Amino acid sequence: IIIFALFVLGCITIKGPMKWALLAATIISILLSWGHNMMWLTDLMIDHFPMYNKFRTVASILVIAEFTMPLLAMLTLHQMFIQPDWWKQHSRAFYGTMGACLLVCLFIYFVPSAFSLYSTSERDQLTAAGLFQQYPQLFMNIEAIRKSVISADALRSLLFLVASAGVLYACLIGKLRVAYAAAATALILFADLFTVNKRYLDTESFTQAVNNVENFNPRPVDRQILADTAQNYRV
């Protein structure tokens, strides 16, 4: 959430071609990641962009946005810290951007049901099987759990955003030294990104090398197959 807020702020405050290039690359990568939801653009890239059809999934293109958004966010931080008159020029943009992000977090926290609690394919499969009608209480419980997860994540984002905005505000009005503000912002950013990344890649995602070696030791049947070197030994 902090990277996103700083990215939006950078789109407003930063001048020059670098901003437009990063913004354009971000938008294009997001549009391309929609795949069949924007099929004309996907077909255009497949037909005319070399090697684009080698992607295993269209979502892989989001790696561009994962690079451009943090880069523009860091450029925004850099200008905030080095330009002495940044606050005078862009205080309204700072208030507006942070306020809008806070309002979005609050809205999601209080109204998690405003967003779909099931994916399109998930809903179609459950509806076709008639499971919504057969087990209404079960799906009510599932929806309640998903709402609580959405609300908890919105609250988490809200707290990180308030903490980072508070540090930056204190720095911009001269109440906190730039070095301390930079260190505090880096720690908050690390905590924000690390806790999200750990959901997808944690300690349970890794195994010791010795376990992997043991898993691939040749079995007697493997040795028997390898012993047959004829060209037509496989069916």
Give the predicted meaning of each segment.
Residues 1-235:
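Conserved luminal/periplasmic juxtamembrane motif of membrane-embedded glycan-processing enzymes
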